[in-house]
Regions:
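The feature marks non-catalytic terminal segments
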Residues: 34-53, 61-67, 78-83, 112-203
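Active-site beta-strand->loop->alpha-helix modules in alpha/beta enzyme cores, enriched
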Residues: 1-114, 161
């Protein structure tokens, strides 16, 4: 199951990232196009899709940071409970405010549960900014145990198909990240196990 947390949108037209990259001025149309990309990527990986209707930051905060953090945390708790998953993979949260708040909320949600939890490095942000990876890991390490796992390569053909499913974003990311974006297709994935501070590594 691949869950997009911030998949909500307001009515009417909006000139944000989703509309700019899809070429669709109406927020609903732009986000439905993005959901179709989610589905294509998930099919390439043999996964199912799930969306939570909380708007991304591009549509305006609508609430204080603490209120938004709590709402996201509660939505993740509910999603984990209803899907009965045994493990959760969380973005490390490197640069984008949406990634960071989702990472923070997810860590709060899953560390209070019995679900096995992991963080992963978002590409190409991690390749382009390795210093941020180290700083973020140190920050997370102040609230939980963080244990590096062996890098994972996986099926590069399926990975390429999944990345290219996001046709509305690929060109923009390619221009913005250049060689670092090219590495998305070949670099191994990086993961860390996260555990409550008092939990033993064998649990």
């Amino acid at each position: 199951m691949i869950t997009t947390i911030l998949a909500g949108f307001p009515p009417g037209e909006h000139a944000g990232w989703s509309s700019q990259t899809t070429g669709l001025s109406v927020a609903e149309d732009a986000n439905l196009a993005r959901r179709e990309e989610d589905q294509r990527a998930s099919r390439a990986l043999g996964a199912r899709t799930n969306w939570i209707d909380i708007p991304a930051q591009e549509y305006g905060p609508g609430a204080s940071t603490s209120e938004r953090l709590l709402r996201i945390e509660q939505s993740i708790v509910a999603a984990v409970s209803t899907t009965e998953v045994r493990s959760v993979f969380i973005p490390l949260g490197l640069t984008h405010p949406d990634h960071i708040i989702v990472s923070d909320a997810a860590l709060r949600a899953v560390l209070a549960s019995d679900v096995e939890s992991y963080v992963y490095m978002e590409m190409p942000y991690g390749q382009a900014r390795p210093g941020r990876v180290r700083r973020r890991l140190r920050r997370i390490g102040r609230q939980c145990n963080v244990d590096p796992l062996e890098s994972f390569v996986g099926d590069l053909r399926r990975k390429s198909e999944a990345v290219n499913a996001y046709s509305s974003q690929v060109e923009t990311l390619q221009r913005g990240f250049g060689k670092y974006f090219d590495r998305v297709f070949t670099d191994p994935e990086r993961y860390w196990r996260v555990r409550p501070l008092l939990q033993s590594p064998n649990r």
